[in-house]
Design a protein with these regions (language model features):
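N-terminal Lys/Arg-rich, disordered targeting/topogenic segments
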Residues: 1-20
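Hydrophobic membrane-insertion alpha-helices, especially the h-region
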Residues: 23-39
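Export/targeting segments at the very N-terminus of extracytoplasmic proteins
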Residues: 41-86, 142-148
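Alpha-helical segment that forms one wall of the substrate-binding/catalytic cleft
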Residues: 58-68, 86-133, 192, 242
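Surface-exposed, glycine-biased beta-strand/turn segments
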Residues: 131-205, 237, 250, 288-297
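Acidic, glycine-rich catalytic/binding loops that coordinate metals and/or anionic ligands
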Residues: 146, 230-231, 236, 257-297
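Zn2+-dependent peptidoglycan hydrolase active-site motif and core
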Residues: 188-230, 250-261
């Protein structure tokens, strides 16, 4: 009689999703995530903020100047120009002054609506202005609450951003040179963290500070650093971080290739690509910070 083979039969347990419970919960979770994102966007305006790279630095300089002369926030003026789709050719100090005259006397944002009605009583226009103001708040964060990077002594500078340079190959100047005496104290323009410190062939002894506003502030050609300052340290606005010099354009320790000065650069993160950071013209900001610090030459 042949042997009987037995095969063990095991039952596989099947798990089924209770659709009546799962899908409503999934839908609620998705709605919660969407609402959280929208709330963050509404609070921060992240979806709409203009980057510094999107704004003409000459226009920005003009708006800052009109604010200083008339006491009207620069972003009100720029927001009106954008709401009216004013072309680049039409933007001018004269137009900015006229807009400021309509808005003079504003002491709080709540008064803006009434002033705008006197200028243009179109509800859609007023909403557009308010929307554009929100989009400009990131730039205003960079603009406000800063100090000039050179201590109050004799110095000179001009708008030499973008000028050609030849050392190390044909390139463009990515900052502003502030000519000053050797050893002039250099200041952190804002609160932030020391991100880079050390030698670069082009920049010599340099220090890079990531401001709390997200901008990378680049100081080059130093003669020396402030004692005890290291990468990762937090710095406060107005804190001495180093001293102007003439280092750079060669191997480590090279000096004397040019007159003492501070090369001051600003770099903005490109949040929409992996391109890294883009050099921004610091000139309009330097003029405004200098004026605010009472150092205007």
């Amino acid at each position: 009689m042949p042997a009987v083979r037995y095969r063990m039969v095991t039952r596989r347990r099947r798990y089924r999703i209770n659709g009546r419970r799962f899908y409503p919960l999934l839908a609620l979770f998705i709605i919660f995530v969407i609402l959280a994102i929208l709330n963050k966007v509404q609070q921060k305006g992240l979806y709409a903020n203009y980057s510094l790279a999107e704004v003409d630095p000459q226009h920005l300089e003009m708006y800052f100047d009109v604010e200083a002369a008339q006491g009207v926030p620069w972003y009100y003026l720029m927001a009106i120009d954008k709401a009216e789709d004013i072309s680049a050719e039409e933007i001018s100090p004269g137009r900015g002054e006229q807009l400021a005259l309509h808005l003079r006397g504003i002491t709080s944002p709540k008064e803006l609506g009434e002033k705008l009605k006197e200028y243009n009583n179109d509800p859609n226009f007023i909403k557009r202005v308010e929307y554009e103001i929100k989009r400009l708040q990131y730039i205003n964060e960079v603009y406000e609450d800063k100090v000039f990077p050179v201590a109050q002594v004799d110095y000179t500078y001009s708008n030499d951003f973008g000028n050609s340079r030849t050392y190390g190959g044909d390139r463009h100047h990515e900052g502003i040179d502030i000519m000053c005496e050797m050893g002039t104290p250099l200041l952190a323009v804002c609160d932030g963290v020391v991100e880079k410190k050390g030698w670069l062939e082009l920049g010599g002894w340099r220090i890079g500070i990531r401001g709390d506003d997200g901008i990378y502030y680049y100081y080059a050609h130093l003669s020396r650093y402030e004692d005890g300052l290291e990468e990762g340290d937090r710095v406060k606005k107005g804190q001495v971080i180093g001293y102007a010099g003439d280092s750079g354009y060669g191997e480590e320790g090279t000096t004397g290739q040019f007159a003492p000065h501070l090369h001051f650069g600003m770099y903005e993160r490109d949040s929409w690509s992996s391109a890294g950071e883009k050099a921004i013209n610091p000139y309009p900001f330097l003029k405004a910070w200098e004026r605010r610090s009472g150092q205007a030459n």
